[in-house]
């Protein structure tokens, strides 16, 4: 059965759509309502589709170049493409070693010619070739041990801010700032050898048995209870007498060495200078840590532990001072039957009520002509004498280098290297203690010592700072050792002369030289005359309890020459009770020269000398 469809003009109607014509652009004239609230999402046909700021995507492995050069398109993880491995294409690969032609064998072995004959088994060649195959981790660890960095991401922690040796007060006026690059260029050549004015004290002879001490034949360090006098310049009775007839600049060898070697120092220190008329008196403050020996001051990573830690900078300095005092006395031939070398005058710091035994130290008062009317008078020290096979007498300066923890200090194991590679041990000490060794050398040169003898002292146990052993000794001539450590005495004299000239141009008063704790420079301050005297007046009645004690476990009552109060340490600090400047100056001026008091403050002593 069929049905016939009639096609008439009324059954099909075509309505043409309404077209919009945009005369000003290419897009539609208006946005339809169906697409009005849909957010716009850009895309590129060459990239995977993604969203703007899609933080839910997987993080890139290398953050260094993250979102730096990549496109923003295709960041969405929902559009990510994951490739599925097709195991049908897996096949074995022949990993057999390919035999190289004869002319290519040994092509990348390196130069082995210079590594032959370095011991049995050619150990030198193995070490030389292995150095070129260090991995990145090995290089990184080596750089960290050396304290160096190669990448910006491996920056070392910022250096620790050090404290100043004395707090700068608001009423101090800065006169001069001298940076180390300028000071290192100074020079004062042709300074003649010092001329002896007076010699005092008694010395013991060095025991040559300690020259045979080595790592296998070590000797324990003994505690020698003797008194060491650390008298400052204006408390020295000999200098007070010489200031009337000799020179116009007065100091001690330790003060001069600190100034001359200031360009090598990193820690803060200070020296008080007093100008009265045409005379300069260089002093150290009482009850300070000026006489303590620094440890690893110039190392790449100096000790930075705080508090009462065993390896804190202050405890290490106290330990080094304790070792030096005991070592310098243990290596001598001591005893009532042993002969001693006596100078013309006796030790000027031994009082009538001296109870303990005084250390073997002799004092040599010398003067130097620095030209332009500057004559320096200083007190220098000798530690011992040595009788040569020819019968000559040589004066010695004895010092000790101490090992505390080679792993923490990035140093060399003394017990492994000292007997076979002593030069490497000394070179490591020159890097870590450049300032201390330079000051010892300057002191030996100023005193005119014939030899400077170093002792290598290590802890018996790395975690015990109270027991030590002597591992060996080594001696040098001061001039030769100065050349080895690149110490220029012309530059040292130039630095001293520069500071003296600056102070001589100032008005009469008290000044302070301080090493900046965090910058390579020293500053000269103009300070009031009574700056460091108030503390001494408050502590006048209790010197026994307030005196500086270098080492806590070596307490022994010992009287000092300048202060009758007992100081329970082997290092007797000659700290005298401070008096009012006007009263002390008037008292000194009213008394005869031979009755002048010996216990006055630096200001009082200098003022009294100038008035007379």
From Swiss-Prot:
GO terms for cellular component: eukaryotic 43S preinitiation complex; eukaryotic 48S preinitiation complex; eukaryotic translation initiation factor 3 complex. One of its GO terms (biological process) is cap-dependent translational initiation. Residues 289-303 are annotated as: RNA gate. It holds the Pfam family eIF-3_zeta. The keyword RNA-binding applies. Residues 97-162, 584-612 are annotated as: Disordered. One of its GO terms (molecular function) is mRNA cap binding. InterPro entries: eIF3d. Residues 122-131 have a biased composition (Gly residues). Residues 100-121 have a biased composition (Basic residues). Coiled coil: none annotated. Its main location: cytoplasm. It is found in: Cytoplasm. Keywords: Cytoplasm, Initiation factor, Protein biosynthesis, RNA-binding. Component of the eukaryotic translation initiation factor 3 (eIF-3) complex. Belongs to the eIF-3 subunit D family. The RNA gate region regulates mRNA cap recognition to prevent promiscuous mRNA-binding before assembly of eif3d into the full eukaryotic translation initiation factor 3 (eIF-3) complex. mRNA cap-binding component of the eukaryotic translation initiation factor 3 (eIF-3) complex, which is involved in protein synthesis of a specialized repertoire of mRNAs and, together with other initiation factors, stimulates binding of mRNA and methionyl-tRNAi to the 40S ribosome. The eIF-3 complex specifically targets and initiates translation of a subset of mRNAs involved in cell proliferation. In the eIF-3 complex, eif3d specifically recognizes and binds the 7-methylguanosine cap of a subset of mRNAs. This is Eukaryotic translation initiation factor 3 subunit D. The lineage of its organism: Eukaryota, Metazoa, Ecdysozoa, Arthropoda, Hexapoda.
């Amino acid at each position: 059965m069929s049905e016939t469809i009639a096609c008439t003009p009324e059954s099909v109607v075509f309505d043409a759509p309404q077209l919009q014509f945009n005369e000003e652009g290419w897009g539609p004239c208006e946005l339809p309502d169906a697409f009005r609230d849909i957010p716009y999402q850009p895309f590129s046909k060459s990239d995977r589709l993604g969203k703007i700021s899609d933080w839910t995507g997987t993080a890139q492995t290398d953050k260094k170049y993250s979102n730096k050069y990549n496109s923003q398109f295709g960041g969405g993880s929902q559009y990510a493409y994951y490739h599925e491995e097709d195991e049908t294409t897996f096949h074995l690969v022949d990993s057999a070693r390919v035999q190289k032609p004869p002319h290519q064998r040994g092509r990348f072995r390196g130069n082995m010619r210079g590594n032959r004959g370095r011991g049995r088994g050619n150990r030198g060649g193995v070490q030389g070739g292995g150095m070129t195959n260090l991995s990145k981790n090995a290089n990184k660890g080596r750089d960290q041990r050396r304290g160096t960095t190669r990448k910006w991401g491996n920056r070392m922690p910022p250096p620790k801010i050090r404290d100043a040796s004395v707090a700068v007060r608001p009423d101090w006026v800065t006169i001069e700032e001298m940076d180390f690059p300028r000071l290192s260029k100074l020079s004062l050549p042709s300074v003649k050898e010092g001329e002896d004015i007076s010699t005092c004290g008694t010395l013991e002879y060095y025991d040559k048995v300690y020259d045979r001490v080595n790592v296998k034949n070590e000797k324990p360090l003994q505690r020698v209870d003797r008194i060491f006098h650390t008298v400052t310049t204006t408390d020295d009775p000999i200098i007070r007498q010489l200031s009337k007839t000799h020179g116009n600049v007065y100091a001690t060898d330790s003060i001069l060495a600190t100034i001359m070697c200031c360009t090598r120092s990193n820690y803060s220190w200070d020296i008080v200078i007093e100008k009265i008329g045409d005379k300069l008196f260089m002093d150290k403050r009482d009850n300070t840590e000026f006489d303590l020996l620094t440890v690893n001051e110039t190392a790449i990573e100096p000790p930075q532990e705080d508090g009462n830690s065993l390896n804190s900078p202050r405890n290490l300095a106290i330990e080094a001072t304790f070792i030096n005092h005991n070592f310098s006395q243990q290596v001598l031939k001591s005893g009532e039957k042993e002969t001693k070398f006596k100078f013309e005058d006796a030790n000027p710091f031994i009082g009538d009520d001296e109870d303990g035994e005084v250390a073997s130290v002799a004092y040599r008062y010398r003067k130097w002509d620095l030209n332009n009317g500057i004559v320096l008078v200083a007190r220098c020290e000798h530690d011992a004498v040595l009788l040569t096979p020819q019968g000559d007498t040589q004066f010695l300066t004895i010092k000790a280098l101490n090992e505390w923890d080679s792993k923490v200090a990035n140093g060399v194991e003394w017990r492994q290297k000292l007997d076979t590679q002593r030069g490497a041990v000394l070179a490591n000490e020159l890097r870590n203690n450049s300032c201390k060794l330079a000051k010892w050398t300057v002191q030996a040169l100023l005193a005119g010592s014939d030899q400077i003898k170093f002792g290598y002292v290590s802890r018996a146990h790395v975690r015990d700072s109270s027991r030590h052993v002597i591992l060996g000794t080594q001696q040098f001539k001061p001039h030769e050792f100065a050349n080895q450590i690149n110490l220029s005495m012309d530059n040292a004299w130039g630095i001293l002369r520069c500071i003296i000239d600056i102070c001589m141009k100032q008005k009469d008063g008290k000044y302070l030289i301080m090493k900046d704790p965090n910058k390579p420079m020293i500053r000269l301050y103009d300070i009031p005359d009574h700056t460091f005297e108030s503390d001494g007046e408050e502590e006048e009645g209790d010197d026994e309890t307030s005196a500086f004690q270098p080492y806590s476990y070596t307490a022994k009552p010992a009287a000092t020459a300048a202060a009758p109060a007992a100081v329970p340490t082997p290092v007797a600090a000659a700290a005298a009770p401070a008096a009012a400047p006007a009263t002390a100056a008037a008292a000194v001026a009213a008394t005869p020269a031979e009755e002048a008091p010996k216990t006055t403050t630096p200001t009082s002593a200098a003022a009294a000398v100038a008035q007379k």
